[in-house]
Design a protein with these regions (language model features):
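Short, polar/charged alpha-helical segment
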Residues: 41-59
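C-terminal segment of classical bacterial N-terminal signal peptides
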Residues: 15-24
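N-terminal segment of the mature folded domain
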Residues: 68-125
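Short, well-ordered beta-strand elements
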Residues: 28-41, 59-64, 154-158, 283
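C-terminal lobe and pocket-closing loops
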Residues: 222-287
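A conserved helix-loop-strand patch within extracytoplasmic ligand-binding domains
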Residues: 104-159
Length: 305
């Protein structure tokens, strides 16, 4: 915690957010509880919010351990914590909209980090060497550029470890784009460390890599991965929620589609907006450029911060 807090002090002082610090005026806002989620970017944001709310607005801010669904449920049912700085809302859009409509929660900031999201990525060097292969569909025609270590005649697509929800989506997209017919193998990295290791190994050796990842993360910042757009448009929530995101046996006919757009909000309770209106305005206006966030996450990893 001390290491993260130290980094947060640096971030609060140095990272450019959309709100000018010169405009901050102290205001009594009372007690504020902030969800500190169990991944790096959300933890950093929570610590920065705590520092700014305390030092800039005179709040008595406290960090509360959290995770996506438990935090949303607690805020919705108990009105606490007051702030969830980085809440990935795709999995519970309807309950969130219901809570907002019924006056319990407020989506204070619909874009606290720019350039984030899940999808399929390649190293930047691959695009420099192959500028014409700038969409997923074009890359899928060239499995020979990503040889699978156990069968060089096949291309390797690195998916998520078993047990992750994204593994289901990747497996169904693999079928939807007929990747097996095109000469691809879906490779399970075995673990989060295995996934990260496959990227670092490929980049360090100057080899090509193609697979799933997400941003903001230290891995994206450190290894310079680029998300590849799909030519296929998003085929709708029904296809995604009722097929792509489900186990294969529940998705008989997956349609080719781009990745579901990730939605991340800073969510606050309605009571916090009323009682700490000036501080709530800060939450609504602070934005982290994705490149800056990734660089901060790399700094945290490299310095064990």
């Amino acid at each position: 915690m001390k290491r993260v807090t130290g980094t947060a002090f640096m971030c609060a002082a140095a990272v450019t957010v959309s709100l000018s610090m010169a405009d901050i005026a102290k205001a009594e806002c009372g007690d504020v509880t902030i969800a500190e989620m169990n991944w790096a970017s959300a933890s950093l944001m929570a610590n920065v919010d705590k520092i700014i709310l305390q030092e800039g607005y005179g709040c008595n801010a406290e960090l509360i351990p959290g995770d996506t669904m438990p935090t949303f449920t607690s805020m919705n049912e108990k009105g606490a914590p007051d702030v969830a700085p980085e809440l990935w809302v795709n999995a519970f859009k309807e309950p969130l909209q219901k809570a907002i409509g019924e006056g319990r929660l407020v989506s204070a900031n619909a874009g606290p980090i720019t350039g984030l999201g899940e999808g399929w990525w390649v190293p930047s060097k691959f695009l420099e060497d192959n500028p014409e292969l700038n969409t997923v569909e074009k890359i899928l025609e060239r499995p020979d550029l990503f040889p699978y270590s156990e069968n060089k005649s096949k291309g390797a697509f690195m998916t998520c470890p078993s047990g992750w929800a994204c593994q289901l989506a990747n497996a169904n997209l693999y079928r939807a784009f007929e990747m097996e017919k095109k000469g691809w193998v879906l490779v399970d990295p075995g673990s989060s460390a295995g996934l990260d290791g496959s990227i670092s190994k490929a980049v360090d050796r100057g080899e090509n890599w193609f697979g799933y990842y997400w941003s903001p993360t230290a891995v994206i910042g450190k290894y310079g991965l680029k998300m590849i757009p799909f030519e296929a448009s998003f085929a709708g929530n029904d296809n995604w929620n009722n097929c792509i995101a489900l186990p294969e046996q529940d998705c008989a006919n997956p349609k080719a589609t781009s990745w579901n757009e990730s939605e991340v909000n800073s969510v606050i309770t309605a009571d916090f907006k009323k009682s700490g209106s000036v501080a709530a305005e800060f939450i609504a206006n602070r934005v982290y450029p994705g490149k800056v966030m990734n660089e901060m996450l790399v700094f945290m990893v490299d310095n064990q911060a």
